[in-house]
Structures are given as C-alpha cells and as structure tokens.
C-alpha cells in the first residue's frame, strides 16, 4: 500500500492527502534530581524525534514543567507574591491537568529518590477549610486538586507528586505509549567519606523521611514492573538517549507509518483541510442539543437536499457550451441560505455539528465546509475560493491538480478569473458548500475588504444543484448585502433559547464537582435574559480557574452584570493580567495600565498573537518574551506559562501544526480595541496610513516579530511571518531584500506546485514593493551578482546574463536552471520585457546542456523561453526553442512519458505551442497531429492536459474538415468543464465560435449562436480586465478583447446586413481600434487594416439599399462571395505582435472587395438616385472620400449642423460614442483625431500608414481562407507574408486630407 501511494503521488506529481494526525506530546515525569537528563533529552533527542514526526505530518513536543525554576525574588511586588503563592498551591492540580492533556503519551524517569510527601498526614474535611493560608503547602495542593476534579488524591495523601502523576497517567488509565526509564547506580562502589556522611545523616531528623522515601520509591518501581509497563534501565545519558529515540521512533512509526511530508512540497492546502477538521472536532465537544438546534438542523437539511441528487459521483447533465456560457438570468430557486444572528449566538458551533451530522448520514453527498475562524492566515477571499475549487476538483477528478507557478494557471491571481474557475468547479457535480463567518473575510492583492464582504463578486445565478450555506453576524455588511439578493433564503438564529438550554450550556463547561456546586446558580441565570451561548461558555470556563486566585462567587456576580460580550471580555482580560502577568518595570498593576495594554507579559503575548500573520508557537512566544527583556527574576517559566494556558485553553487554541490562534473573533476584537488601541482590524490595516500613538504600538509589535524572525532558520515559518511584518511596518528595503535574497529565491524556486497562498503572497509583496517605488528586478540582479562575486576568484569561465555575471558551474546546472525559470516567472508576471535579455544571455548555456538527468528541467526552460518569445512577438525565435524541446522529447517513448508526469506535461505544452507557431510543412513532416492523437490517450486521467490536447488536436485539424472540427469542439466542452474554465476555455470558446462560423458558410442557422458565444467571451474578458493589476495580464486581456471584438463585428457583418447589425459591428470595430492603438501603438499594421475596412463600410453604406446592393454585388455562386467581413471573424489579433498578419489579411480582403465593386458600375449610379439623409438612417462618411462623394454629402453636413448636440455613449476604456442618434459613425477622438493635422497630411496616413500586402488568391480562395482558420496562422512571424504587390489604395489626395480635417472640425463643433 505504501509503495502504491508513493507511485500514485509521483505519477500525478501531486501531494498525498494529509489526515488529522494527533501531535505526540508526552508528559515528562521525574523527581528534581533529573535535571541533567531533562536537559539532554530536550536539546539532543527531542529535536530528532520532532524532525521524524515532521515527515509524517505531525510534531513531537514534550511537556516539561520544571518547578525548580519557580522561585520568589525579594524585588517582587505584592501582586507577584500573591501570584507565586497561588501558583504553588495548584502545583499538583496543574501537573495532573497536563498529564490528562498529554494522554496517552507519558515518559517517566525514576532513580533512588521519591520526592516530597506528607509523612504524618492527618486527613481533613474539605468543607471545614475556611482559609487556604492555614494549611501547609502540601495540604494546599491536596485541597486545590481535590476541589478541581481530582478528589481521589485524598485517598492516598501520603504520595509524592511523582507518584500522583504516575497514578493518573498509568494506574488509573491504560495506554501502550508510556515508557519508564530507571536510572541504575552501583551502591557497592562507595568511598569511606560517603559512608561517614551516611552515618551522620542517620542522626539527623530528615533521615527517617528519606528512608521512607527510598522504601516508597522501591515499592513504586515494583508496582510499575508488576503491571507489565515497559521499563528500561540506563546508566548514562547516551544510553538513555538511545533508548528514548528508539522507543518513541517506534511509536511514531506505529501511529503514522506512511511518510506524508516530502521536501520541496507546499502542503498549505492539506493543512487547511486539517484546520477545518480540527475546528469541527472542537465544536463537537462543547455542543449542546436544544429545540432551537434541532429546528435549525431540519431547515438546513431540507434546504441542502432539495433539488439535489444525493449521488454526487454522477456528473451534471448538460455539460455543453451553453451550460458553460450561462446567462445571468433571474434565479428560479433560492440556492443560498444565510444563517445569521448576533455575535456569540452559537452559529459556528451549530453549523460545525450539522456538517458532521450531515456527512455521517449522507456520505455520498459532496460537501465542502470552510470555517473562516479556524485559521488566522487564510481568511482572504481568494484563498477561500481557491480552497473550494481544489476540493471540488479533487472530488471530481481524483488527485489534486497541480498549480504550477509558471503555467497558465497564474491567471487565477486575477480575482474575476478565479471566480470563473469557481463557477466551473461548482458545475461539475451536485455539491453543498458551507462558508462560516463571512463577516471575517478580508481582501488581498487588489481586492478590498469591503468587496470581499459584500459578495458583489458572487454571480447572481448559481447552478440549481449547488447549495451555498453561509453564516454571518446580523449587523455585518455581508448580511445586509446578501439579504438584498433574490436567491438568498435567510434564517435567523435565536441566541437566547429557553432556560433549560442555558443551564445545559453552562453545565457543559463545568467539571463534575462544579456542576453540583453551581447547581444553585440556576435561579441567578434565570434573572439574566441577555445571556447568549458565548457568555455562558465564557463565565463557566472562567469560574473553574479564577477560584484559585479570588472569590469565584464575586467573579460570577461581576460577569453576570455586564451587558455585552465585549464588556465581559474586558473583565476577563483584566483578570488574566492581574493573576498571571507582571510588567518589566517595577510597578503595581492598575486598571488604567490593563485597559491601555501598557504592562505585563500576558498583554504582550495577546498582542503578539493578534499581530502575527499565521499564529505563533509556544516556544516562539517564550523566546520572544525573553528577547523583549523578560529574563532573570522577570522570566516567564514553563510553570507560569502552563498556568496561563490552562486558563486560556478554550480561547487560545493550538492548530494541528502547533501554532496558537484566537478561537473566537470576539477575543481578537477585544485585544485589538483594548490592548492595541486600534479601530481597524490588524488584518485589514494599511501600512501607508498615517500612524497615531496607538498605531505606533501596533508597529512596535510588528517590529518585534520582524526582529525575531530575522534570526530564525526554518524557512516556512520565516516566509509566513517575516515579509508580512516588514510590509506592515513599512520597511520596504528589508522586504525587497528578503524576497530577492538568494536563499529565499532558491528555496521558493525549488517548491513543486506551490500553493495559491504561497504564490499569492509572494506576488502581493512584489506588487506592494512596485507601488512603493522599489526596483525588485534590480534587487534580483544584485542578489545574483553577489553569488557570482563569491565564486569569481575560483572560476574562469563566466556567462554574461542580462547585466549580471553568473557562473553556472558554481551554482550547478540544475540549480541555475531552477533559478532561471523562477526569475522568468517573476519577470513575466510583472510584465517586464527584460526577461528577453535574461534568456538571450542564458541561451548558449541551455544549448550546451547535454546531461540526461537534466532533461526535464531543460524542457521546462526551453518551453518557458519559447513562450516568452511568443508573447513578445518574436515567433521565429520562440519556434526555435519549441523545436529543440520537440527533438529532446523524441528521445523518450510513450511508455517513458506515461511513467513521468512532468515529461508528459512538457510534451503536452510543446505540442500545443508547435500547433500555434510551426509551419504546416513542419507539422506534416513530423506527424504532430498523429502524435497528438496518440498522446491524448495517455492523459485521460488529467483533465487539464486532456483539455489542452483536445484543443491542440482541434487546431491541427485541416480546414476542409469543417464538420469534424465542429464535432471535435463539441467533444472538448465536457473536458473544459472538468478542467478550469478560465483562460483556456475562453480560447476554446472563441475558437469554437470560429468553427460555428465555418459551418455558417453552409448553414446560417448557427450564426446567431456564434454571436451569442462571442458576446459572452467579451463579458468574461471585460470582467477580467476590470480587476487585473499586473500590466502584462491587463495588456494581454485587452489585446485578446480587441481580437474578439473584431471577430464579433465580422459575424454581424456576415449576416443580413441590417442597419442595426451594421451599427453594432462598426461600434465593435472602433472599440477594437482604440484598444489596439493603446496597447500595440498607433503605427501597428493591424490598425491600417481596420481603418480601411471602416472606410469601405462607410462608402457602401452611402448607398441606400444595402441588402439589395450586397446581393447584386455578390450574386449567389460568385467566386468573390467571401467578403472582407466574412473573413474577419477568422482572424486572431492576439498574436498580432507580429506586425504583418492583420494588415495582410485585411488588405487582401479589401482588394477583393474593390475588385468585386468595380464589376458593378451601374450599382453606384442606381444608388445615387436616392437622396441621402431621408428615409432610413445612413452612415455619414467622415473619413477619406473623393470630391464627388464630398459634393454629394454636403447637404448631410448642413442638416446635421442644425441638429441638437449629440449624446455621447459610454464605452469601455474611455472611448467616445461611435454612433450618434442619427446613425452617423465617428472615429474615436481619443485615438484617431488626437494629433494636429497642420501638416496637411491626415493622421491616418501619417501615423497608421503601413505597406499593404498582397490580396487573396483569386484562383484558390479556399487556400487563403484555410490559412486564416488554422491556429498556426495566428502566430506567424514578421517574416511570414505574401509576396508584396502594388498597393491597393493609393496615397490620399489633398482633397481627401482636407475633407478629413473638415470632418474633424465638425466633430469639435
């Protein structure tokens, strides 16, 4: 089984699914004379065991309460002496508490000593004890332990603390994970001086007690051996260490036999899954069943299973393109349920228990719960959505899909695209999503906290088979926004409940003795109608701890008097500080100090936890306190910490990875408000906002944590915390130095499939630095230069790389390539063109690499370089790298590819890139289509690769096989549905629409459907552009949008040529023109082609009977029937980085149009009989025109001047209206007429003029059309073009230029 799991993980290059692993926390029991053994184990053995546990998904941490370190100091304040006395009185009780918490793990060290005990003890009645001070320390410990859950200690009062611990751990309970280590000594080898000292001790008063102790320890050892407990005997520290390491390694192996954690794997998602499971388990322990809870359970279940097929293993019907391209219509059913109520009413506990109950009764239903309060670092909306996507895809597709930092999935960092992926994921199978605590959601990477909370990002129509259950505080923005939606059903949770329920909740959190003692509190609870479950839980848990330090009944009265949860927390925080804390300065703790949060280590701990990004471990907090100055007699010992944690265990809980966090948001709010003094949540605060005195305190704690983690060496902890605190402190130089440091860069670049959280925060820090004006790229280059400088004296051969000098031999080839790919991803994501220079210098090295062991890394590098050249328009160079990668891949058989998922992935990418860039001859000679068909059979279990291969096959299908192409596109849709539904599906939708257009050439019934598909693609791209923050992402989205606009215009112009369709098409062309001028430059060749097309449309619309004219112009069966706009939808301008393709195709079509028009001279004369401007609205030609056309249209301008001012429509990218209310079309002023025309030459000629290309072949028009349809044509290099012929359009005359200027002046009016 283990081998199968490892093989499966390697096959899919995915991480194993981590399960809830209970941490191994043995309690260390020994007498005071074992300090050397404890130190040796803590420093040498336990770290080894923790490393061993780390590979199994858990951790090892021994609990060692060393009371010897607890000493009173003469400089103590009165409050500290009180704390010291109270702490000693609960010595026994505290130890037994931790024995229980560590069960079933226990380590006992025994020697010749027994420990302190009461030799002549007289039993006393607990009820007769009036004053604890009247008892001895031993009696105080017995009294406190007996009153707090351990009454059995009074039955054997003459035992030592060590024996009490052994009784509780091993005699009263049974466990196979308990080990006893007996220290042996040779009593025969004694000197004469030792014998004389023993004779003197016999005469002392303590001799008899010591002798009794030796007898007792002997009996205790015999009892341990008699019970068959595992006992080991050791003579020295090394022997003890070997025994402990062997025994507890076997325990780890027995409990967690499979190695779950591997190096260079990001397990963030798996750990999040564990956090939610742990949260549910904690809520189950405190849940109280009531009438209200049963009623809510029934409502939740009715909502969840309504219209839901309980067999979630079946896919959703209707997985075609129409279901993918959903139109946001009004919902026919309510697919969202909102459970709301006041804070502390028990929403989270109720939902967690309902989720557990529902899963147990309906195991076949796909349910994904997410509790925002279960972890403090993953409360941003993008992490939440990504968690849902990963869980849904895992259930639908098997192993989790990899999320490569360098692949196309980087666009999930665009929030709107992530939502598209989410919508695709919930369409896979019937599912139930549960999101608890939505008012705590925060934004990140351009998403504001308000946007995250108001749920405006959630589409108005969810699939009927998806049920979304949310919970929120009634007064929150989330609740108010969701209540306004028509598809939301609201359920209000009554927080008060009946009296029996209140008392049950109160008793649930009390120990058995306390339940009897506080039974008399029932009448008091009845008098307080404002007690919600959170208040009752807080009061009950406090009463069990506060009685050691003060009168519990007085505390109860104070707690019951407060009106709100926040006021109750203020009282509890005040008690924690007074009873457990002390300040660094010698001054009494006052109420003012407590409220201001200015004193005490407890205050510092709470503030540090609140400020931390992902939580802090116990060891980290104690080390930070020591760094802050809590040393010597101010030192916070393990015993002090244990007492504090015992009181806060219900509210400061430990995650499965050992980090502490606030269990309830109300505690975090109280700490932020009363101790930090901030009004804005720490997680939503902006470091750039001006800081007042209270914010300075917050910044101080950020700086403390920053200083601490700068000294740490564990990468993941440093990465989680250090850059966060640098950002929040505004320390931009340090943040830039951190993310560009060689150590951090090297580690991150080696991570396989980094989680979204890891990538998101890295890119977020890059984005923050760019906004702050830092040059992150230069920092990267300087960092690499430092590496080179260290080895410059040893190496002679150097390779110059983009302004820096690197030594691949020093870095090792694999490490060099890894760093290169990481830096490429960084540059590409930031839209930096210097990536080109980077790879230009690296190319000689890449070519020289011949090691077979580096083939996978080399393939990845070659693919990355080729794609980079593809993006910047250097198609031929990109193709060169794709061909090299293809040659390297041919060394492997299909069987080899099947074994290695990484090789298969690179194979898929290479074929996809070749299909888009290689010539038809290369594809035929290398049988790429046949090879792609064969490879597709091996990727059936990976939806992403399967979708990519099907898309590649579709691109490679010859043009003549139109019906096969369309059928292939239909078969691709379900695969896309199973994949991501993001950028790849957008490409396929656009390509599929082109296939529908080809079918339109034979049947026009499909044209309307193609138009709708294009409009949906435009909406998707517009939404993506509205939230894109990366310049490269935004540029590509806008270029892609321009392509789709042109295609849609071509679809409209290929129809019935009605006035409305023509106006709409022209508006799309002008929008495309604006986008292309903005992102490709006004001199780009494609702009000239679009402008020529617009002029021809305007000239044609100058005639009165468009449909009739077009029918006459292109009679049925004519070889010229393929007009310029019929071919327009087949163009893809996304790759118009190459400056020839668009202009070539456009001008070829224009040439055909003019030739066809010249064959019908009588048509123009017929049209001249109709007076323009009357009857149907016409296009007013305002571009270049002849003198005759100018004269014919002079009356139009005269009539238009008399009309009222035209209203301007609103179009994306700040373009002016292209169609006025009379149907006149005007060029975009922003793009076309923005420059002066004083030179007499029109702007269109002076800026947009490019040489025109040859026309389509009149003999074989299908050959040219096939080139338009083929995807590879879309990525031609600048050298690919037809043989230039004489320009179709001569240079404009001065009359045309003046006419153009007149039109411009008229627009100004």
From Swiss-Prot:
Main location: cytoplasm
Keywords: Cytoplasm, Repeat, TPR repeat
The keyword Protein transport is annotated on this UniProt entry: no
A Pfam family matched in the record: NACHT
Subcellular location: Cytoplasm
Keyword Cytoplasm: yes
SUPFAM superfamilies, per database record: P-loop containing nucleoside triphosphate hydrolases
Intervals holding TPR repeats: 399-432, 651-684, 817-851, 859-892, 989-1024, 1042-1079
GO CC annotations, alphabetized: cytosol
Coiled-coil ranges from the UniProt annotation: none
PANTHER family: DDB1- AND CUL4-ASSOCIATED FACTOR 12-RELATED, DUF4062 DOMAIN-CONTAINING PROTEIN
Name of the protein in its database record: Tetratricopeptide repeat protein 41
């Amino acid at each position: 089984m283990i081998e199968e799991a490892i093989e499966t993980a390697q096959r899919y290059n995915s991480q194993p699914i981590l399960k809830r692993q209970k941490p191994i926390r043995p309690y260390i029991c020994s007498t005071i004379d074992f300090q050397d053994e404890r130190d040796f184990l803590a420093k040498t053995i336990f770290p080894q065991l923790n490393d061993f546990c780390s590979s199994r998904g858990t951790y090892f941490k021994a609990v060692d309460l060393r009371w010897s370190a607890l000493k009173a100091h003469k400089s103590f304040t009165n409050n500290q002496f009180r704390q010291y006395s109270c702490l000693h009185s609960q010595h026994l009780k505290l130890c037994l508490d931790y024995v229980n918490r560590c069960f079933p793990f226990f380590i006992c060290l025994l020697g010749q000593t027994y420990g302190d005990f009461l030799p002549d003890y007289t039993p006393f009645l607990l009820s007769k004890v009036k004053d604890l001070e009247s008892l001895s320390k031993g009696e105080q410990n017995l009294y406190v332990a007996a009153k707090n859950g351990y009454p059995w200690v009074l039955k054997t009062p003459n035992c030592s603390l060590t024996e009490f611990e052994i009784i509780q751990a091993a005699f009263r309970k049974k466990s196979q994970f308990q080990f006893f280590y007996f220290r042996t000594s040779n009593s025969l080898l004694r000197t004469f001086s030792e014998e004389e000292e023993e004779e003197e001790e016999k005469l002392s008063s303590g001799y008899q007690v010591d002798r009794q102790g030796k007898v007792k320890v002997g009996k205790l050892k015999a009892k341990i051996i008699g019970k068959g407990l595992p006992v080991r005997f050791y003579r020295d520290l090394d022997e003890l260490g070997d025994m402990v390491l062997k025994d507890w390694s076997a325990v780890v192996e027995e409990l967690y036999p499979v190695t779950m954690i591997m190096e260079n794997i990001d397990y963030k998602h798996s750990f999040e899954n564990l956090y939610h499971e742990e949260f549910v388990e904690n809520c189950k322990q405190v849940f109280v069943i009531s009438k209200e809870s049963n009623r809510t359970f029934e409502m939740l279940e009715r909502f969840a299973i309504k219209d839901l097929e309980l067999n979630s293993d079946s896919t959703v019907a209707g997985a075609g393109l129409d279901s993918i391209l959903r139109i946001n219509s009004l919902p026919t059913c309510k697919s969202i349920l909102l459970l709301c109520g006041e804070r502390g009413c028990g929403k989270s506990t109720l939902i967690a228990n309902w989720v557990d109950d529902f899963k147990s009764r309906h195991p076949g239903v796909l349910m994904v719960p997410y509790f925002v309060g279960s972890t403090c670092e993953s409360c941003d909306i993008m992490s939440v959505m990504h968690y849902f996507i990963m869980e849904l895809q895992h259930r639908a597709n098997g192993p989790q899909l990899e999320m490569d930092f360098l692949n196309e999935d980087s666009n999930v960092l665009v929030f709107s695209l992530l939502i598209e992926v989410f919508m695709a994921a919930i369409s896979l199978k019937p599912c139930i999503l549960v999101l608890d605590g939505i008012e705590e959601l925060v934004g990140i990477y351009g998403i504001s906290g308000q946007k995250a909370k108001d749920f405006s990002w959630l589409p108005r129509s969810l699939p009927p088979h998806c049920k979304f259950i949310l919970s929120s505080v009634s007064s929150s923005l989330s609740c108010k926004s969701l209540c306004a939606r028509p598809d939301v059903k609201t359920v209000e949770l009554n927080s008060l409940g009946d009296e029996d329920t209140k008392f049950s909740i109160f008793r649930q959190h009390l120990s058995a003795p306390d339940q009897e003692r506080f039974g008399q509190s029932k009448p008091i609870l009845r008098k307080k109608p404002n007690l919600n479950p959170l208040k009752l839980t807080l009061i009950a848990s406090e009463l069990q701890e506060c009685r050691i330090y003060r009168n519990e009944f007085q505390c109860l009265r104070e707690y019951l008097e407060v009106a709100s949860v926040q006021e109750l927390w203020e009282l509890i925080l005040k008690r924690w500080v007074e009873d457990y804390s002390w300040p660094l300065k010698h001054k009494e703790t006052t109420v003012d100090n407590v409220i201001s949060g200015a004193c005490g280590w407890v205050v510092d701990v709470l503030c540090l936890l609140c400020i931390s990004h992902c939580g802090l471990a116990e060891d980290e907090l104690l080390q930070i306190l020591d760094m802050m100055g809590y040393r010597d007699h101010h030192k916070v010992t393990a015993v002090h910490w244990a007492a504090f944690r015992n009181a806060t265990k219900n509210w400061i809980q430990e995650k499965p990875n050992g980090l502490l966090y606030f269990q309830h948001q109300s505690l975090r709010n109280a700490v932020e408000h009363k101790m930090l003094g901030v009004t804005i949540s720490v997680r939503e605060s902006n470091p750039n906002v001006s800081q007042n005195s209270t914010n300075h305190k917050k910044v101080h704690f950020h700086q403390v944590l920053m200083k601490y983690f700068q000294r740490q060496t564990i990468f993941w902890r440093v990465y989680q915390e250090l850059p966060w605190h640098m950002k929040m402190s505004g320390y931009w130089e340090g943040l830039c130095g951190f993310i560009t440091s060689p150590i951090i860069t090297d580690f991150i670049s080696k991570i396989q499939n980094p989680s979204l959280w890891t990538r998101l925060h890295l890119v977020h820090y890059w984005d923050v630095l760019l906004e702050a004006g830092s040059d992150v790229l230069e920092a990267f280059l300087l960092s690499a230069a430092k590496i080179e400088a260290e080895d410059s004296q040893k190496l002679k051969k150097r390779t110059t790389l983009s302004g820096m000098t690197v030594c691949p031999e020093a870095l090792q080839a694999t490490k060099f390539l890894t760093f290169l790919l990481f830096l490429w991803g960084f540059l590409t994501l930031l839209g930096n063109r210097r990536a080109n220079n980077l790879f230009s210098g690296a190319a000689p090295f890449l070519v020289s690499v011949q090691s077979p062991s580096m083939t996978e890394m080399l393939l990845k590098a070659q693919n990355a370089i080729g794609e980079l050249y593809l993006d910047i328009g250097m198609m031929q160079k990109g193709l060169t790298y794709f061909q090299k990668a293809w040659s390297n891949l041919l060394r492997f058989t299909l069987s080899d590819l099947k074994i290695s998922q990484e090789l298969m992935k690179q194979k898929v990418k290479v074929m996809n890139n070749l299909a888009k860039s290689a010539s038809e001859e290369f594809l035929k000679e290398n049988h790429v289509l046949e090879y792609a068909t064969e490879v597709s059979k091996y990727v059936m279990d990976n939806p992403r690769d399967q979708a990519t291969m099907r898309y590649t096959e579709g691109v490679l299908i010859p043009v003549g096989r139109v019906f096969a192409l369309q059928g292939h596109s239909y078969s691709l849709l379900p695969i896309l549905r199973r994949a991501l539904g993001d950028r790849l599906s957008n490409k396929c939708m656009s390509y599929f629409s082109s296939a529908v257009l080809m079918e339109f050439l034979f049947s026009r019934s499909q044209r309307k459907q193609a138009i709708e598909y294009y409009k949906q693609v435009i909406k998707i791209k517009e939404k993506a552009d509205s939230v894109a923050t990366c310049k490269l992402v935004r540029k590509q989205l806008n270029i892609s949008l321009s392509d789709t606009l042109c295609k849609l215009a071509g679809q409209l112009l290929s129809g019935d040529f009605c006035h409305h369709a023509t106006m709409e098409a022209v508006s799309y062309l002008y929008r495309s023109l604006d986008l292309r001028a903005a992102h490709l430059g006004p001199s780009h060749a494609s702009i000239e082609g679009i402008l020529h097309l617009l002029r021809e449309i305007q000239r044609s619309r100058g005639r009165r009977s468009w449909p009739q004219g077009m029918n006459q112009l292109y009679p049925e069966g004519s070889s010229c029937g393929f007009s310029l706009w019929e071919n327009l939808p087949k163009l893809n301008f996304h790759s118009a980085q190459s400056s020839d393709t668009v202009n070539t195709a456009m001008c070829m079509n224009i040439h055909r149009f003019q030739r066809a028009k010249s064959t019908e001279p009588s048509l123009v004369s017929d049209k001249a009989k109709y007076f323009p401007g009357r009857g149907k609205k016409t296009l007013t030609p305002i571009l270049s025109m002849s003198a005759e056309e100018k004269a014919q249209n002079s009356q139009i301008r005269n009539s238009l001047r008399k009309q009222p001012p035209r209203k301007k429509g609103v179009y994306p990218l700040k373009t002016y209206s292209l169609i006025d209310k009379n149907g006149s079309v005007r060029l975009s002023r922003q793009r076309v007429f923005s420059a002066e025309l004083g030179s007499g030459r029109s702007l269109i000629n002076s800026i947009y003029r490019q040489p025109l290309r040859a026309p389509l072949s009149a003999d074989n028009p299908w050959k040219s059309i096939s080139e338009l349809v083929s995807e590879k044509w879309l990525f031609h290099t600048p050298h690919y073009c037809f043989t230039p012929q004489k320009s179709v359009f001569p240079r404009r005359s001065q009359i045309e230029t003046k006419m153009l200027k007149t039109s411009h002046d008229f627009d100004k009016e």
